[in-house]
Curated annotation (Swiss-Prot):
Domain of life: Archaea
Keyword Cell membrane recorded: yes
CC annotations in GO: plasma membrane
Gene3D superfamilies: UbiA prenyltransferase (1.10.357.140)
PANTHER family documented for this protein: PROTOHEME IX FARNESYLTRANSFERASE, MITOCHONDRIAL
Catalysed conversion reaction: heme b + (2E,6E)-farnesyl diphosphate + H2O = Fe(II)-heme o + diphosphate
Keyword NAD among record annotations: no
Family the UniProt entry places it in: Belongs to the UbiA prenyltransferase family. Protoheme IX farnesyltransferase subfamily.
Described function: Converts heme B (protoheme IX) to heme O by substitution of the vinyl group on carbon 2 of heme B porphyrin ring with a hydroxyethyl farnesyl side group.
Record organism: Pyrobaculum calidifontis (strain DSM 21063 / JCM 11548 / VA1)
Subcellular localization(s) per the UniProt record: Cell membrane
Protein name: Protoheme IX farnesyltransferase 1
Length: 278
């Protein structure tokens, strides 16, 4: 059972599920626990299914990388065929429940989130281009927009702008992690940004992108979450992230980049919590 739970990548998908909940609560202006429960269930199944499919599709990559070599498929804990069946069953259930329980528009965003991660990122671009993360990041937009559509019944400019807080955070976060494990990715033949453009250029790009994503989140907070509590929460997280980014840009060492990764990781969570409290 533990091996199958690992396939869901709980440390990854919980943030996407939180994004869907934040979109719903903000748009609805309150909580209908029946709707929220249905949203969380559909999001859990769809994101978990896409994560499990990623485990199946990338089992050869995982086996070649030290960081991922102890995952269930490389370790032989789950047969590939069973992992595939498990992933497709979860995915189908999540998308179906999205349409049946949430409605056409939220359901479409649930399906789009699955598609961008499982197909665009995992199947199409992961092994082909460093743009993989930029394209796959639209899964983050989709989960937020799905929740927002459920809460308000439609999508507006505020929804789109706020969804890009998730999108912009994703590449800075993933590329910071990829910087630490760049030799793993190079050995596995995966064209992540630090592998493609080199270490020094990668430090500049990732640090600047991290500052830009944090600045964007701060701007959204000023525009849409003008409460003192929201401003204080985001200010604390943003300050730490910007300071660590500047430190990484100056030092340009693996240790400094790892500090930036750790410091910036909570920023999106803080923002999404602030969205729910608005």
């Amino acid at each position: 059972m533990k091996a199958y739970l690992t396939l869901l990548k709980p440390r990854v998908i919980w943030l996407l599920i939180l994004a869907s909940a934040a979109g719903y609560v903000y748009a609805a202006g309150g909580v209908d626990w029946g709707k929220l429960s249905s949203l969380l269930l559909a999001a859990l199944l769809a994101t978990g299914g896409s994560a499990a499919f990623n485990h199946y599709w990338e089992r050869d990559i995982d086996a070649a990388m030290r960081r991922t070599s102890r995952r269930p498929l490389p370790m032989g804990l789950i047969k590939p065929g069973r992992a595939l069946a498990f992933s497709l069953a979860l995915s189908a259930a999540g998308v179906a429940l999205g349409f049946l329980l949430l409605g056409p528009l939220p359901g479409a965003f649930v399906a789009l989130g699955w598609f961008f991660y499982a197909v665009v990122y995992t199947m199409w671009l992961k092994r082909r281009s460093w743009l993989n993360v930029l394209a796959g990041g639209f899964a983050g937009n989709a989960v937020f927009l799905g929740g927002y559509a459920l809460g308000k019944g439609h999508i507006d400019l505020a929804a789109v702008l706020m969804s890009f807080a998730v999108y912009l955070w994703i590449p800075a976060h993933i590329w910071s992690l990829a910087y630490k494990y760049k030799e793993d990715y190079r050995r596995a033949g995966v064209p992540m940004l630090p592998v493609v453009i080199g270490e020094q250029k990668a430090v500049v790009v990732i640090s600047v992108l991290n500052v830009a994503s944090v600045a964007y989140i701060a701007l959204l907070t000023l525009l849409f979450l003008p409460s003192l509590l929201s401003l204080l929460l985001v200010a604390v997280g943003a300050g730490a992230a910007v300071a660590s980014s500047i430190y990484a840009l100056v030092k340009r060492t693996e240790g400094a980049m790892w500090k930036m990764y750790k410091s910036s990781a909570p920023v999106l969570t803080i923002f999404l919590v602030a969205v729910m409290l608005a």
